[in-house]
Amino acid sequence: SNTNLTHIIGYLRTVSEDFLKDAPEELKYHRDDIYGATGIESYYEHLLRGKNGFEYHLVDNRGIDHGILLDENRTSPQKGETLLLTIDHDLQVLVEKLLTNYKGTIVCSNPKTGEIHAIASSPDYDLSSFVGPIPMDLWQNWNTDENRPLFNRAINGLYPPGSTLKL
């Protein structure tokens, strides 16, 4: 059985000129870099990002690359941190299945440790749609859908307190 973890992982976006105006200087974003826009990708962007590398290439007037120029000025990219989540796969599959065809959210946590074992928001969206450019009609559909599939009800929803199950 599969889970999509849509609202947990979140999605990535491409850095725009507007984003650069407000971006933290210490992360050194450049136009067309990729950044975490929502979910864990956004919250832990500062850890996951890593650092860009660069190297100078000698390219002639015909566009032919003749290799690296000034190897001592080369900087290798640095990988970002690895995160370990406390999500229980089987429980996550179950909560996503329970929410199928419903609008709502389920959060399963350990009250003693604060660990989140499952968290889902419905409706959601196909996370693979964010690989490559998103067709404008799909983006508009998501943003005009009255069920708000991009909205993470578990994190961003404001609800009055209700009864809780006490064990």
Q: Where do the language-model regions lie?
A:
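Residue-level preference for non-acidic, small/hydrophobic
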Residues: 8, 95, 114, 164-167
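Ser/Thr-centric signal marking residues that sit
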Residues: 82, 86, 113, 164
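Extracytoplasmic/periplasmic proteins that interact with beta-lactams or build/remodel peptidoglycan
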Residues: 1-105, 120-153, 158
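Short, glycine-anchored, charge-dense loop/turn motifs used at functional sites
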Residues: 110-117
